[in-house]
Amino acid sequence: FKSFSDGSLGSRSAKLYTDYADDPGNTGILVISPEDLAKRMYKAYRHGLQPATHCIGDKALEVTLDAVEYCLQQGLKDGMTPEEQAKRLPFRIIHAQMATPELIERMKKLPIVLDIQPTFLMTDLHWIEERVGKERAVLSYPWKTYLDAGLIMAGGSDAPVESFNPWIGIYATVTRQDMDGYPVGGYHPNEKVSVYDAVCMYSKNVAYANGDQDLMGTIEAGKFADMVVIDRDIFHIPENDIKDIQVLNTYMAGIERYHRD
């Protein structure tokens, strides 16, 4: 059940704590009041739906976490047991592009999954510092920091806004570069994610986000045999080549559904 808390960095409508560096006086917008967002999310949560909230700016993230906490507290007041709450699908925070250390500490205590779109960075890295300032740019797209904090990230594309090609998404996660390999070494390379963790983001973590971790996401006995065969070993090629990976075969439930000629 999707909601929107704010806009985007490109349009300067993502809600920030302070002014945009290139637009003094503008902190972006909340597209829904904090109170209404919390009530909307709780209505979905109470009826067994999975709340998923678009959230890009740091202030929008704070408002969204407030709403998650409200849902959990209100659920207890309405008779839900902690055990019942633990069985619910995790709250999904879509994008989570900016986060302060304080917000990350709050997220560590909540049943959430971060829906990350790494390909956003391939475009944004060219102007993000000008848009939000160097200090906040350091706090943007902090994937390794999220990982080190124990947060679960599920990789996505936001297609058709960006390419749906997962190999490009994994490439962006691992290199933090655009398609031309800019910047050399990657944008804030301390936030790079390993190839293994990036693959997990696009497989097992997505299954977890959907509540399907017992059915898919890893190749194990008893799970659906949904898998692909690719033309090179992603763990033993130069990182720059990841974006060029091609699928040779696609299997669903163990049946070949695609074969590349």
Label each region the model flagged.
Residues 42-52, 59-91, 96, 101-105, ...:
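His/Asp/Glu-enriched, well-ordered alpha-helical/loop segment
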Residues 1-50, 78-79, 104:
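Active-site-adjacent helix-turn-beta-strand microarchitecture at beta-sheet edges
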Residues 260-261:
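Extracellular/periplasmic ectodomains of large secreted or surface enzymes and adhesion receptors
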